[in-house]
Each structure stands twice: as C-alpha cells, then as structure tokens.
Amino acid sequence: MATVLFVKANNRPAEQAVSVKLYEAFLANYKEANPNDTVVELDLYKEELPYVGVDMINGTFKVGKGFDLTEEEAKAVAVADKYLNQFLEADKVVFGFPLWNLTIPAVLHTYIDYLNRAGKTFKYTPEGPVGLIGDKKIALLNARGGVYSEGPAAEVEMAVKYVASMMGFFGATNMETVVIEGHNQFPDKAEEIIAAGLEEAAKVASKF
C-alpha cells in the first residue's frame, strides 16, 4: 500500500479546462488500478496559501538554526510545515496544472515555495545543493492550448519546465510527464488531441 498525494492547481470546471480533465482521468484510472492505496487530494484553490514573505523566510531560517521564533514567524512556518510534511510523507505525488501566461498558477508556485526547505527536500554540500527525495515517484500532468514542445514557443514554456526543475532540484529521479497540447491551436483536431492525451494518462496512471 502506498500513500499518493494528488495536487490540483486549477479551479475551473472540467468542461472548461483540459488540465482538469487530464487530472480527473489520471485520478480515476489510478484508483481503479490501485484500490488499496491511500489517495489524498489537495485542491490548492481551496487552501489558504499566503505568499512567502519576511515571517516565513525568517521563521524557516530560525527553525534551521534552532533560534526562537516570533508569534508571526511561528504561524507562517506552521503553514509551510503542514504542506511540506504532507508532501514528504507521500510515496507518490501527482501534480495537475495548466500553462497560464507561459507559467504555472500562482497557487502552485506558492505551494512549491513551501516545499523548498534546506534539510528537508535538499541539503547544502561543499559541491552544491543535493536533493533528498530521490525515491519519491512524481507525475506531472499539464495541458496547454498551444504547442510548446517544439518550435519557437518551446523556449518560453515555463510550466512543466519549472515544476520538473524543482522536483529535480529536490532529487526526484522517477518522474512521469503527460502533456496535452495544441487543442486550441488546432481546433479541428481538438477532440482527437484531447482523447489521445487522456488515453496516455490512463496508461501511465495504471502503471504509476
């Protein structure tokens, strides 16, 4: 039995959002293939996720050094710790997110900021930072209306690149990625593109 954390970063309904369709398809197929696993769903738009600021930065630094925290710092660290510990305790983590304005939704960026903790997800060494979550399985589920996997737009895709880079920085070595793209760029092929992506999601989910 494994504990699997599903992180959803889009609050649009499925009929309006291909990334939500992708997320829901992966979730349903995973549950069907792994009925005994513990599945935890985290909808970031239903959470209170304050931006990282002075209290959280100073608080997490003080925690690492064993210093006393102010009341405000302690509250900020407690918020980050809640999500960090949940992430660390999961055997597998699935991220479902769109590409908006070339990058990820702000709630997902903030959530990943909470995970970025020296001594927890990575450590400093004389040779540079080393990730600490190498045995955790990660799946990235992304949808984008245009084509960003190749051509001139590839350089400006900062959604999958960012999340994959952060998970790599944390030491993840077992990552799966499912992307649906081009359904807005090629509306006459949209149904075919989306159907193929959902089929791929089902295959990956059944083996994840």
UniProtKB/Swiss-Prot annotation:
InterPro entries: Flavodoxin_fold, Flavoprotein-like_sf, FMN-dep_NADH:Q_OxRdtase_AzoR1, NADH:quinone_OxRdtase_FMN_depd. The keyword Flavoprotein applies. GO terms for molecular function: electron transfer activity; FMN binding; oxidoreductase activity, acting on NAD(P)H as acceptor; oxidoreductase activity, acting on NAD(P)H, quinone or similar compound as acceptor. Homodimer. The gene is azoR3. It comes from Bacillus cereus (strain ATCC 14579 / DSM 31 / CCUG 7414 / JCM 2152 / NBRC 15305 / NCIMB 9373 / NCTC 2599 / NRRL B-3711). The keyword Oxidoreductase applies. This is FMN-dependent NADH:quinone oxidoreductase 3. Its cofactor is FMN. Keywords: Flavoprotein, FMN, NAD, Oxidoreductase.
